[in-house]
């Protein structure tokens, strides 16, 4: 059994904790995750590894439903945290985790992503205060950060207001890509974590706007 668990842990399917094991497997079979999760997985995983290092034990963390944020959530399973999320797939990861407290935000559930959004979600979030909010985005241009749903960006703005620190996690393919709904200006988040394939021009641009962290390891893996 121990050997089987070690193999599953190497595959990132489970996370072993003291006295037990927790599921931390792949994203659920929702259109949002099925179409995106396999793409640029190495980049998303590198970004997630950097993001979880910013989160301290006993932090209150608010997580959205992006595929990169889901990777962050997988790596947080088993840690003593207060987790708040708008995303049902993320909530499912922590539902059986006795080491963390879980609050699930309700509202209008998007069937593609399993994410709560809209006025009910915004109302619940407005009554909360968290240490860190972690968000994914669909696009980044000179005009700012974008996502692909008007209700979603309204909810994410409430998530930003609720946090002492806002962390955006985005792989380098998002730069120069515009999506439907404008979320915020480039300098609005406190921190942006990207992979090491970010174009140099964007690296300089974003470094002038906010705290930019470049997650290393992707280029090295491709060389090897």
Which residues make up each language-model segment?
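A residue-level structural signature of the nucleotidyltransferase/glycosyltransferase Rossmann-like core
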Residues: 60, 82-83, 132, 191
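HTH-adjacent hinge/linker in prokaryotic transcriptional regulators
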Residues: 2-66, 73-78, 82, 94-99
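Conserved phosphate- and dinucleotide-binding cores of soluble alpha/beta proteins
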Residues: 10, 16, 43, 89-224
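Short glycine/serine/threonine-rich phosphate/pyrophosphate-binding segments
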Residues: 68-72, 175-178
């Amino acid at each position: 059994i121990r050997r089987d668990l070690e193999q599953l842990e190497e595959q990132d399917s489970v996370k072993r904790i003291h006295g037990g094991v927790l599921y931390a497997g792949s994203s659920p079979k929702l259109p949002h995750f099925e179409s995106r999760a396999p793409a640029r997985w190495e980049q998303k995983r590198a970004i997630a590894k950097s993001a979880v290092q910013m989160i301290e034990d006993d932090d209150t963390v608010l997580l959205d439903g992006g595929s990169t944020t889901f990777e962050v959530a997988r790596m947080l399973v088993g840690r003593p945290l207060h987790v708040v999320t708008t995303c049902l797939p993320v909530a499912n990861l922590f539902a059986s985790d006795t080491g963390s407290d879980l609050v699930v935000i309700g509202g209008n559930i998007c069937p593609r992503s399993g994410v709560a959004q809209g006025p009910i979600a915004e109302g619940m979030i407005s009554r909360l205060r968290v240490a860190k909010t972690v968000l994914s985005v669909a696009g980044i241009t000179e005009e700012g950060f974008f996502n692909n749903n008007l209700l979603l960006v309204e909810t994410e703005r409430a998530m930003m207001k609720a946090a002492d620190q806002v962390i955006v996690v985005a792989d380098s393919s998002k730069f120069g890509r515009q999506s439907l709904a404008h979320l915020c200006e480039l300098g609005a988040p406190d921190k942006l974590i990207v992979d090491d394939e970010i174009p140099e021009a964007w690296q300089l641009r974003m470094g002038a706007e906010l705290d930019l962290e470049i997650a290393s390891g992707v280029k090295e893996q491709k060389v090897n």
